[in-house]
Structures are given as C-alpha cells and as structure tokens.
Amino acid sequence: MLDQTLEPLRAVIARHGLSADKRLGQNFLLDSQLLDRIARVPGDLTQKTVYEVGPGPGGLTRALLKAGAKVTAVERDRRCLPALAELSAHFPDQLQVISGDAMEIDEAAVLGEHVHIVANLPYNVGTALLIRWLTAKTWQPWWSSLTLMFQKEVAERITAKVGTPHYGRLSVLAQWRSEAKLSFPVHRSAFVPPPKVMSAVVHLTPKDQPEGLSLGTLEKITAAAFNQRRKMLRQSLKNIEHMMEALELAGIDATRRPETVSVAEFIAIGRHWEKLSA
C-alpha cells in the first residue's frame, strides 16, 4: 500500500520546479489510474525485481511501489534526482535510484536475473533500448518481461502482423525473440506536456528458445529487404551472394515483397543462406 503521507505528485513537481525536457524525450505521466494500469500489465509484482528507465519525477515509480515491486530506477536527468531521493527515503527497502544513462549500464550485473522492465521510455531512446534488450547475448535473457510505453506508431511496428502496413524489421526482430502484444493505447492528453502523437503500452515476453539463426544474419536480410520494401525480394536481395538460392531452398517466391514474408519464413531463408555461405 502506498504511503498516504506522500506528497501529491503534482505538488512534488511544482516544489522542485520540474518540467519535461524535450531534448531528453521526456513527457511526464501523472494520471494515477493510468499508471496503476500500466503497473498491472506484467502481472503480480509483489517482491519482484523491476527495472524502470527514465522515471522522471516518479509517477510510474509510485505505481510500481504500490504494486509491491522492488524497483531499481535509472535516471539521467539530474533535476529529477532530489524528487526520486525523497521517494526512496519513504521506501528504503523497495527503491534504488541510479543516476546515469540506461544505454551504458551493465544491467545483468546490476540487476541479476528474472527482472521485469516497466518504463515510460524517453521517446528519443526507446527503440534503441528495446533492440538492446531483444539482442541480449545470452538467451534466456536477464529480463522476464518488458512493459513499455512507446509512440503508438512504434508500438504498432513492434506488434504488427505480416502483411500489414506497419510490419517491418522491428516486427521481425521483436517477434523472433519474444511474444509481443499491444496492451492498450494512451491518449496524448494523459501526458504533461501533451506530445504531438498518440502513445501505446506494449508487453513482451521472451520466447523459450528463438529458432536457431544468428542475429547478424537476420539483421542483414531484413535490412536489405525492408530498405526497399516496395520491391520484390529478387530485387532487394540480389546483391547478397547465395540469396536467390536460399529463397528457392526455403520455398519462397522471389517475386514476393518483404511485407508478405512471415517471421518463420525469414528464419528459413536465413538458415539456408548460412549453410550456403559456410
């Protein structure tokens, strides 16, 4: 249960003179009901380790603490650290705040295993962080689930089904290594200040064992294919040696366009290409 003596979040923001910094991709989320809803997406967090990136003044952090989680939050905006320190003082056994850049932290070493990542990600680094987590060198990864706020367009790319307009490289990567679903949209009016675009919460859980294929191979093929997404595969992949043979062995018609190729089919193409290139 959240400490009833906590100062209201808006009052904390006003007292510390905080405002969202566009340079850091910040948009503060203050709606407590919405924050509680986000915290419920991963399931029961009681005594679970949760990693939060970019907590800002601590709105989502409060919801996670209320849910019983043990939270490690990393924040690069030093203006927010005093407000987070006050929150940590209320929850000394539940909240650890790290001042730093999430892209530079050795998360597995700091956090251990079986970590739930829950974050309203800064828009300017959200996709880079997702790719970092999806391409963990060891699998199973150190994280157990990802519950992340993105711009709605990015969320749709992550969860897009084959044959739909948003299906692309990010869809293939995310769905190769995880089960990804769009949990719910979030209206721009929920943020302070309101961003220009709508947002959405995405939930990802790692697959037990992604089908055997090197990350480099998948990235090479999908980059070439989707960089020319309106072209047939025989055009977009023609400069990769042995690729036409790999398509034939995988039973893929070279006149198809990349948005019609499923994740499983990209994996099959990659496997045959690796054998031919060995």
Curated annotation (Swiss-Prot):
PROSITE patterns assigned to the protein according to its UniProt record, in alphabetical order: RRNA_A_DIMETH (PS01131), SAM_RNA_A_N6_MT (PS51689)
CC per GO annotation: cytosol
Catalytic reaction annotation: adenosine(1518)/adenosine(1519) in 16S rRNA + 4 S-adenosyl-L-methionine = N(6)-dimethyladenosine(1518)/N(6)-dimethyladenosine(1519) in 16S rRNA + 4 S-adenosyl-L-homocysteine + 4 H(+)
Matches recorded under InterPro entries: KsgA/Erm, rRNA_Ade_diMease-like_C, rRNA_Ade_Mease_Trfase_CS, rRNA_Ade_methylase_Trfase_N, rRNA_adenine_dimethylase, SAM-dependent_MTases_sf
Catalytic activity, EC: 2.1.1.182
Keyword annotations from UniProtKB, A to Z: Cytoplasm, Methyltransferase, RNA-binding, rRNA processing, S-adenosyl-L-methionine, Transferase
Binding site for S-adenosyl-L-methionine: 27, 29, 54, 75, 101, 120
A matching Pfam family: RrnaAD
Disulphide linkage map: none
Record bears the keyword Lyase: no
Listed GO MF terms: 16S rRNA (adenine(1518)-N(6)/adenine(1519)-N(6))-dimethyltransferase activity; RNA binding
NCBIfam families referenced in this protein's UniProt entry, alphabetically: ksgA
Biological role stated in the UniProt entry: Specifically dimethylates two adjacent adenosines (A1518 and A1519) in the loop of a conserved hairpin near the 3'-end of 16S rRNA in the 30S particle. May play a critical role in biogenesis of 30S subunits.
The family this protein is said to belong to: Belongs to the class I-like SAM-binding methyltransferase superfamily. rRNA adenine N(6)-methyltransferase family. RsmA subfamily.
Listed name of the protein: Ribosomal RNA small subunit methyltransferase A
Recorded name of the encoding gene: rsmA
